[in-house]
Structures are given as structure tokens and as C-alpha cells.
């Protein structure tokens, strides 16, 4: 993917942002609007979508109330986008939810829901849009939102960590699959703590059984740590500035929180140190 021109790659191009009703998705949408992109906002939360739209700089835009974890719903949304803007040039597969719990204690129904939202929605986005991006012969980019939890692990975060690791693996494979294409870039976004309401599930309209969520102390502690941490986290607007710069530079890894670099390095070194155990 070397050789992609560093021109004004954003203005008048179409950006689809899932999970746009709040948090990171809202930050990406506001930044895209400032760049005078055609901005498509997609989420289950209709009120949040309207609020995001009201905060945006005036630009060509559309709101689609959609469950991206449902392929039929997502496919219908694609038809609406095509009729209004044509090709999606920048695909932000950003929708996601948080669910804590130990690996053997998370309820099966809740497991399926977080897999559907955090992983299958990304897969559906790729299924629906990558072929037309390649065929367009225009500068395009795919950004899949993972997390620091897509690289490192902690206790009692099995559902979230599993899905976010899967997004990293999927995106790395996608990057390899498109390695010979000099038009379509690929990035995986792995942020640390950001000012979002991901820990607050009530507003999402999701069919989650709260009573079956793991009540072990470690699960509660991690959920509380995250709830406290996001209050002081990076602003979505600052994160979006980093993301768009990384896209412009065609960088695969988008790691927005330097305080986690040492943790990433320790994790990589642990893997490297144990390779000799296979001899």
C-alpha cells in the first residue's frame, strides 16, 4: 500500500461512521464534517444521532437509524447511502459495546450480543463495502475500531477482550489481503481511555440480560475502573484529530495513548522470550 498520494483526500469524499451517536463515533463525525466530507451517521440510538448531527459543521450528511449487527438492516442502509452519495470512501467500523465478566461466567446470550455488535458488524461492513471501494479506483480507507483490549488483556474482561482481539486479527488479515492495492488503505484503531459512555448500556437499546452479567468482584472492579477512567480520558475530538492524521499518512496501527506503549512492549517481549520453549 505504499505510494498512496498525500493530497486532500477527504474533502467531498463520503465517510460512513457506525456508532456515531456518541463518543468516538461522534468525534470522528465532527472532524469529518469540518473537512467538508459527505458524512453518513449510523447508530441504533436515534436521539444520539440527532444530537451528533446538530453539533456538526454544515456539510452534506445523512442520518441512518440502523442495527449494524443485523446484516439485512445494514444492507438496506447501504442502498440508502448509494442513492445519496454513491461510493463510501472512508469506512469507520466503529460501533461497539462493553461487557465485563470472566470467560466461563458470561451468559451465552450476552456473549452472542457482544460478538454480533463488536465483531459481526465489522465483518458485515467489509462484506458490503470493500468490493465497491476496490472497484472505484479512488483513494479509500477502512478503519476498524478495536481497543487497547485488542492487544493486551486483563482479568474479568473476557467478552470485550475476545471481540476486540478478533477485530485486530481481522484487520491485520484485511491489511494483508489488500497489500497489493495502492488505493485502499487499512487501519486498526486501538485507543485507551476515551471520554465515552460505553460503560452505560441503558441508552443503547440492546437486548442484554443485565441480571446475568458476572457479579464477581474482579468484574465489578474492572467495570468501575473503566467507568472512572473514561471520565478523565482523552476527548473524542482529540482522538479524531489523531485518527485522521494517521489515515492521511496511511498508517496501519492507530495507537492513540502513549502511556500504554510500555505495556504493549512488555506483552511482545513475553511472546518473544517464550519462543525458545517450543524448541
Task: Kindly label every feature range from the protein language model.
Residues 102-103, 107-115:
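Substrate-binding pocket helix/loop in short-chain dehydrogenase/reductase
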Residues 147:
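Residue(s) in the substrate-gating loop at a strand-loop-helix junction
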Residues 3-39:
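Canonical Rossmann dinucleotide-binding motif of NAD(H)/NADP(H)-dependent dehydrogenases/reductases
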Residues 126, 163:
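Active-site helix of classical SDR
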Residues 46-47, 65-76, 108:
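The beta1-alpha1 cofactor-binding region of Rossmann-like NAD(H)/NADP(H)-dependent oxidoreductases
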